[in-house]
């Protein structure tokens, strides 16, 4: 039996052409469409065996070079048991049609694989499950968030058992392939046109049975652990951001990769600065004399220098914002820095002495309209309504 002839394709056929040919023939000879037809059942097994080999690049290369008795062949040829078992043929059928149900390697995985990922544990039909992802919260000071910092976290979870290297068995002879599911972890049953797969009750979906479990992990392949993890937090992070550390979650099972560690950031508020994106806002209260005459003032910053000199122009009004470029927060993606926005608040004096009041009265007597352009404009607008108003 030549596998290419069975599928009706050339030896140079692409993987897509091979899959297309198999799907057409598998549907044609599927037992649900041909109940009681022994010849159709035989053809279904043959096309499934051919597809199992030709759809695998490594097996196909070996088949092209050595034929059915190549180094990857089992006791019954490339199909393991020559596809004599209908269960194997149905499993191959589901694998070929699995991509239509979520892109998984089988019908069962296509339906249910996404749920495992949502909870941080991805699995395959042979029972290998990625370790669960972990999450921790870390609180930073405002300054630490601005400059970046390295933190050490204590993380509890599971690590790979060093005694058995994650196999769960005391030695190599302590593991055997599950005879019921032949290592797939699934039992395939025909339920209408699309066959269904269920977890193998013999091995619990693991695809293998541990006959001599490891004494350290009791057959689990991993043990509870607490470890210190060093986290390098970049400058510019903000509350609500998270860092992903691949492979720092729980150890996987049956050789599957470890989960990830997610570090959620909280940043404490600052008594002086307010953050808005990459910009910093500083409220600067000044007296009305400084507002009128202008001034130069040292103001705080988050840079190493600690301060910078700000020029307040004369005649500045309350609420005016002065921008100091590149004195804000660093961008977490390395795109420069934000600005320092200084919001001026002109404070009206309180608790004046008689001498101060007298000086203000003298100043008031010298006021001119051009000293208060907003006041003059306001009075001009309402002059027609209130005749007793004078300037």
Swiss-Prot record:
Zinc fingers classed as CR-type: ranges: 148-226
SMART domains, per the entry: DnaJ (SM00271)
Pfam families noted in UniProt: DnaJ, DnaJ_C, DnaJ_CXXCXGXG
GO molecular function: ATP binding; heat shock protein binding; unfolded protein binding; zinc ion binding
BP GO annotations: chaperone cofactor-dependent protein refolding; DNA replication; protein refolding; response to heat
SUPFAM superfamilies recorded: Chaperone J-domain, DnaJ/Hsp40 cysteine-rich domain, HSP40/DnaJ peptide-binding domain
Any one GO CC term of the record: cytoplasm
Entry note: cofactor: Binds 2 Zn(2+) ions per monomer.
Chain positions of CXXCXGXG motif repeats: 161-168, 178-185, 200-207, 214-221
Highest taxon, organism lineage: Bacteria
InterPro entries according to UniProt: DnaJ, DnaJ_C, DnaJ_domain, DnaJ_domain_CS, HSP40/DnaJ_pept-bd, HSP_DnaJ_Cys-rich_dom, HSP_DnaJ_Cys-rich_dom_sf, J_dom_sf
Domain J residue range list: 2-67
Localization per record: Cytoplasm
Residues where Zn(2+) 2 binds: 178, 181, 200, 203
Alphabetic keyword roster: Chaperone, Cytoplasm, DNA replication, Metal-binding, Repeat, Stress response, Zinc, Zinc-finger
Binding, Zn(2+) 1: 161, 164, 214, 217
Domain comment in the entry: The J domain is necessary and sufficient to stimulate DnaK ATPase activity. Zinc center 1 plays an important role in the autonomous, DnaK-independent chaperone activity of DnaJ. Zinc center 2 is essential for interaction with DnaK and for DnaJ activity.
Role of this protein: Participates actively in the response to hyperosmotic and heat shock by preventing the aggregation of stress-denatured proteins and by disaggregating proteins, also in an autonomous, DnaK-independent fashion. Unfolded proteins bind initially to DnaJ; upon interaction with the DnaJ-bound protein, DnaK hydrolyzes its bound ATP, resulting in the formation of a stable complex. GrpE releases ADP from DnaK; ATP binding to DnaK triggers the release of the substrate protein, thus completing the reaction cycle.
Family designation: Belongs to the DnaJ family.
The protein's assembly and partners: Homodimer.
Protein name as catalogued: Chaperone protein DnaJ
């Amino acid at each position: 039996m030549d596998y290419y002839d069975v599928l009706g394709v050339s030896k140079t056929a692409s993987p897509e052409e091979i899959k297309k040919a198999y799907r057409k023939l598998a549907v044609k000879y599927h037992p649900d469409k041909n109940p009681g037809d022994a010849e159709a059942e035989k053809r279904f097994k043959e096309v499934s065996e051919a597809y199992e080999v030709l759809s695998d690049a490594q097996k196909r290369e070996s088949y092209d070079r050595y034929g059915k008795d190549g180094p990857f062949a089992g006791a019954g040829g490339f199909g393991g048991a020559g596809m004599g078992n209908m269960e194997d043929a149905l499993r191959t059928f589901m694998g070929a049609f699995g991509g239509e149900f979520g892109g998984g390697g089988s019908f069962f995985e296509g339906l249910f694989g996404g749920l495992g990922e949502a909870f941080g544990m991805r699995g395959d039909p042979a029972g290998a499950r990625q370790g669960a992802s972990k999450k921790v919260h870390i609180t930073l000071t405002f300054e630490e968030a601005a400059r970046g910092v390295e933190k050490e976290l204590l993380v509890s979870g599971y690590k790979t058992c060093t005694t058995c290297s994650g196999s769960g068995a005391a030695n190599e002879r302590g593991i055997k392939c599950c005879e019921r599911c032949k290592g797939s972890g699934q039992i395939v049953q025909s339920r209408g046109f699309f066959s269904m797969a269920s977890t193998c009750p013999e091995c619990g979906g693991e695809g293998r049975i541990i006959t001599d479990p490891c004494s350290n992990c009791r057959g689990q392949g991993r043990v509870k652990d607490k470890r210190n993890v060093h986290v390098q937090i970049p400058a510019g992070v903000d509350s609500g951001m998270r860092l992903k550390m691949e492979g720092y979650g729980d150890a996987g099972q049956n050789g599957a990769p470890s989960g990830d560690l997610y570090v959620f950031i909280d940043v404490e508020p600052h008594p002086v600065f307010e953050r808005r994106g990459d910009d910093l806002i500083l409220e600067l209260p000044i007296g009305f004399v400084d507002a009128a005459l202008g001034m130069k003032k040292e103001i705080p910053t988050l840079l190493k220098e600690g301060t910078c000199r700000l020029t307040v122009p004369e005649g500045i009004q309350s609420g005016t914002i002065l921008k100091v470029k590149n004195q804000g927060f660093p961008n977490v993606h390395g795109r420069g820095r934000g600005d320092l926005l200084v919001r001026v608040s002109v404070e009206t004096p309180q608790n004046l002495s008689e001498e101060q009041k007298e000086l203000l009265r003298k100043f008031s007597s010298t006021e001119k309209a051009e000293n208060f352009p907003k006041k003059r404009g306001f009075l001009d607008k309402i002059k027609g309504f209130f005749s007793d108003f004078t300037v």
